[in-house]
Amino acid sequence: MSESRTSADGGMETSYGFREVPGGEKQGLVNQVFHKVAKRYDIMNDVMSMGMHRAWKDAMIAALNPRKEPGYKVLDVAGGTGDIAFRIVEASGRQAHATVLDINGSMLGVGAERAEKKKLSGNLTFVEANAEELPFEAASFDAYTIAFGIRNVPRIDKALSEAYRVLKRGGRLLVLEFSEVDMPLLDKIYDAWSFNAIPQFGKAITGDAEPYQYLVESIRKFPNQENFAAMIRQAGFSRVTYTNYTGGIAALHSGWKL
């Protein structure tokens, strides 16, 4: 489970994959990972999910069911390349406005380029900022989405509290994340794929296995479905549920600010 701890010298430590690092160092280490993979992020997700992330994301947007009306505002966090935001805007009939927030400028650069090619720039705003300290007024958004990003945040509880703060009353939180496989045979297959194949595929694609090794380890350190649902409730959300995808390889968590 990814959480902050107090070290022997009184400082806060958190997990970076299977390593324990000072809390203040994790974000910089994660940034290095995503600077390396930004240009090939979709390929990375294909490798990590065995190609299933596209269907999971489509299911996430179907669950959100964005309103087809002007003024509907969504904050997509850790969404630099725009993959989720583009889907939201299209699903709303190009009525919604999505703010794409990411701490990594390289990822945002890829997203902005793609938005121009898709002629969606008018529906999108790209913001470089930290999920733990959102630069928005309270009650600014109708929905908050984050896909495969929350496990990379050093202080997950802080990010969830910020999500609650910036949502309007009646707003919805949706978190799509790799999770704990709940099928006995599938868990062994996915473990073998994750620790043996994924880093090697990553090295073949990008020339560097290390970012993929971290990403695999970060999945194993992330809270399981029930524990993460409890964290969402602790942040103040109501009607908290989750839906497993592909035997729990990923899970979609939902909560409401009521």
Curated annotation (Swiss-Prot):
Record-listed S-adenosyl-L-methionine binding positions: 81, 102, 130-131
Region of interest (Disordered), ranges: 1-20
Name of the protein this chain belongs to: Ubiquinone/menaquinone biosynthesis C-methyltransferase UbiE
Statement: the UniProt record of this protein carries the keyword S-adenosyl-L-methionine: yes
NCBIfam families: MenG_MenH_UbiE, PRK00216.1-3, PRK00216.1-5
GO biological process: aerobic respiration; menaquinone biosynthetic process; methylation
PANTHER family associated with the record: 2-METHOXY-6-POLYPRENYL-1,4-BENZOQUINOL METHYLASE, MITOCHONDRIAL, METHYLTRANSFERASE
Gene: ubiE
Gene3D superfamilies found in the cross-reference section: Vaccinia Virus protein VP39
Family: Belongs to the class I-like SAM-binding methyltransferase superfamily. MenG/UbiE family.
Main function: Methyltransferase required for the conversion of demethylmenaquinol (DMKH2) to menaquinol (MKH2) and the conversion of 2-polyprenyl-6-methoxy-1,4-benzoquinol (DDMQH2) to 2-polyprenyl-3-methyl-6-methoxy-1,4-benzoquinol (DMQH2).
Catalytic reaction(s) noted: a 2-demethylmenaquinol + S-adenosyl-L-methionine = a menaquinol + S-adenosyl-L-homocysteine + H(+); a 2-methoxy-6-(all-trans-polyprenyl)benzene-1,4-diol + S-adenosyl-L-methionine = a 5-methoxy-2-methyl-3-(all-trans-polyprenyl)benzene-1,4-diol + S-adenosyl-L-homocysteine + H(+)
Pfam families: Ubie_methyltran
Pathway the protein takes part in: Quinol/quinone metabolism; menaquinone biosynthesis; menaquinol from 1,4-dihydroxy-2-naphthoate: step 2/2; Cofactor biosynthesis; ubiquinone biosynthesis
Keyword S-adenosyl-L-methionine annotated: yes
